[in-house]
């Protein structure tokens, strides 16, 4: 009976019920009118921020900033996950009470995200009263819907992952001391057998609804969607969603039974509802949502979270954007190997935008990526210092552009022999916003940045071949050609900086300031690029450039990057 109820609930959530078409349409319109919610995972406070946390936040930030630049109202939520056994143990090891420990580490996350210019609109802490209220209300809803019951859980539990595991998700392993232990197949962390009376969630009844949800292809990139389908090929066991307070004291109490605390992952996942204003219905409790997450927590987001939402009568997430991990110099990062990359140190070495650009340009969500200081230095010097910075310097230098303005453009000024090159460049520039849009929406930010870099290099080649420094200002035809070359290069730079803004907002702002672009025109919505090349009125012709503040991105010397 619960299975059929779950399927009916899921159909109604998506507006598929034939007997309530108008109501469903109104509901869909109401949901669609709400701001789109982008989220990072909330990060566990048992340890300091690392490169993986930063990468999740950057990918979410790009999606959020790009939506805003396109005129779409959106929010970005991040935060810290502060309950559970690992936190309790970490605080105890330092002789601190859990709340003090959580506040200290949570501040570290907020500080590094501020340093990286993450444009979050909400920072949720799971120890906040508003979140505790949301979790308690959500639990009661699941209970009222008949999805929670009391039973005995017997099986494997991984404290490091805060995860209950089936026999098939574990394997026997020999540790460094030669002892036989059992570990999680996914994480490699040790598991222990537990047998305790807990509250259980009827996950088994929701498998058909989850399979229906997967038909909408919500998980990206495709290999991760395939993995979730693989997990759902077998029956799902019911899930333990509480721990006895005698075993774990640091958590949110079960509303109707204070001898139990709510399972840390149920607690943590509800943060997305907390950020949306749940349980206050006047705060648009749950609208369109996109979750950014690492592949190590995919199961929790692609099975448990949509199941919880469907059971509570709420729509599952629209998109799960999943990324892989970072290694260091070809090796998994480990404190014992002393190869952990410190984000704060990277900001000092490469600047905020340098680190942002390297991670977004070098990282690819569908595969693990390797961080090396050598590749970071080479990439940043090549693409930011030389290509983009060099192009800006060339067309704004007083020797080339003595009037320090956007000159006039006329296609006819170009010699017939070079018009094919001009035509090709214009075609590439006109196509670039379309390509960038497609790649960002496909969660392939590195591909979007690759397209921009290719166009920047094409512009440099165009500028070099036209050699405006050889053209004499005193000769009318040469002066007109010089002006057209400079205009086209400046307009190209305006386009590049606008498209780069979601990835490197600080650097893009420097370029747009130098070009004298008003803030209202730093958007993709109702913005016209290259108007003069189409014979249209161009706002920027004869506009004065902004002040010169020096090199856009000074080259990194070897000593600075190692």
UniProtKB/Swiss-Prot annotation:
Origin superkingdom: Eukaryota
Residues that bind ATP: 335
Transit peptide, from-to: 1-10
Catalytic activity: tRNA(Met) + L-methionine + ATP = L-methionyl-tRNA(Met) + AMP + diphosphate
Family matches, as Pfam families: Anticodon_3 (PF19303), tRNA-synt_1g (PF09334)
UniProt key word Chloroplast: no
Residue window of motif 'KMSKS' region: 332-336
Entry-linked CDD domains: MetRS_core
Family: Belongs to the class-I aminoacyl-tRNA synthetase family.
Name under which the protein is recorded: Methionine--tRNA ligase, mitochondrial
GO cellular component entries: mitochondrial matrix; mitochondrion
Subcellular location: Mitochondrion matrix
GO terms under biological process: methionyl-tRNA aminoacylation
E.C. code: 6.1.1.10
Entry keyword set: Aminoacyl-tRNA synthetase, ATP-binding, Ligase, Mitochondrion, Nucleotide-binding, Protein biosynthesis, Transit peptide
InterPro entries in the record: Anticodon_Met, Met-tRNA_synth, Met-tRNA_synth_2, Methionyl/Leucyl_tRNA_Synth, MetRS_core, Rossmann-like_a/b/a_fold, tRNAsynth_Ia_anticodon-bd
Biological source species: Xenopus laevis (African clawed frog)
């Amino acid at each position: 009976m619960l299975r059929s109820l779950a399927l009916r609930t899921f159909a109604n959530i998506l507006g598929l019920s034939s007997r309530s078409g108008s109501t469903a349409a109104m509901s869909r319109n109401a949901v669609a009118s709400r701001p789109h919610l982008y989220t990072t995972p909330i990060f566990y406070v048992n340890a300091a921020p690392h490169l993986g946390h930063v990468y999740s936040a950057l990918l979410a930030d790009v999606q959020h900033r790009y939506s805003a630049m396109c005129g779409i109202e959106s929010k970005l939520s991040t935060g810290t996950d502060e309950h559970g056994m690992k936190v309790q143990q970490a605080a105890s090891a330092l002789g601190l009470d859990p709340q003090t420990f959580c506040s200290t580490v949570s501040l570290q996350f907020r500080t590094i995200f501020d340093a990286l210019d993450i444009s979050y609109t909400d920072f949720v802490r799971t120890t906040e009263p508003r979140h505790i209220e949301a979790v308690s209300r959500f639990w009661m809803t699941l209970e009222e819907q008949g999805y929670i019951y009391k039973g005995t859980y017997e099986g494997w539990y991984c404290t490091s992952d805060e995860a209950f595991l089936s026999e098939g998700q574990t394997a026997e392993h020999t540790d460094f001391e030669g002892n036989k232990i059992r570990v999680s197949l996914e994480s490699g962390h040790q598991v222990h057998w537990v047998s305790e009376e807990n509250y259980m969630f009827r996950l088994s009844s929701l498998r058909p609804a989850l399979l229906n949800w997967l038909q909408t292809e919500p998980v990206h990139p495709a290999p991760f969607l395939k993995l979730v389908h693989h997990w759902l090929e077998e029956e799902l066991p019911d899930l333990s969603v509480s721990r006895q307070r005698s075993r774990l004291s640091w958590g949110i109490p079960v509303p109707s039974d204070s001898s139990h605390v709510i399972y840390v992952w149920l607690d943590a996942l509800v943060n997305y509802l907390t950020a949306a204003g749940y349980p206050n219905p006047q705060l648009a409790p749950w609208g369109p949502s996109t979750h950014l997450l690492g592949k190590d927590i995919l199961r929790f987001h692609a099975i448990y979270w949509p199941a919880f939402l469907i059971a509570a009568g709420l729509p599952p997430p629209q998109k799960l954007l999943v990324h892989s991990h970072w290694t260091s110099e070809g090796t998994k990062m480990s404190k014992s190997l002393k190869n952990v990359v410190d984000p704060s140190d990277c900001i000092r070495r490469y600047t905020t935008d340098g680190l942002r650009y390297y991670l977004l340009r070098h990282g690819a969500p569908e595969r693990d990526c390797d961080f090396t200081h050598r590749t970071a230095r080479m990439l940043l010097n090549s693409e930011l210092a030389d290509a983009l910075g060099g192009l800006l310097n060339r067309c704004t230098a007083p020797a080339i552009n003595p009037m320090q303005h956007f000159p006039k453009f006329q296609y006819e000024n170009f010699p017939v022999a070079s018009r094919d090159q001009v035509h090709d460049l214009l075609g590439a520039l006109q196509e670039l916003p379309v390509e960038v849009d497609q790649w960002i929406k496909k969660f392939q930010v590195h591909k979007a940045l690759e397209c921009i870099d290719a166009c920047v290099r094409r512009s440099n080649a165009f500028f070099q071949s036209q050699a405006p420094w050889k053209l004499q200002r005193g000769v009318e035809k040469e002066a007109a050609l010089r002006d057209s070359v400079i205009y086209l290069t400046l307009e190209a730079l305006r386009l590049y900086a606008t498209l780069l803004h979601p990835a490197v907002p600080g650097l893009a702002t420097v370029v747009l300031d130098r070009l004298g672009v008003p803030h209202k025109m730093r958007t993709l919505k109702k913005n016209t690029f290259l108007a003069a090349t189409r014979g249209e009125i161009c706002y920027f012709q004869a506009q004065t450039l902004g002040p010169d503040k020096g090199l856009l991105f000074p080259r990194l010397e070897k000593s600075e990057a190692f």
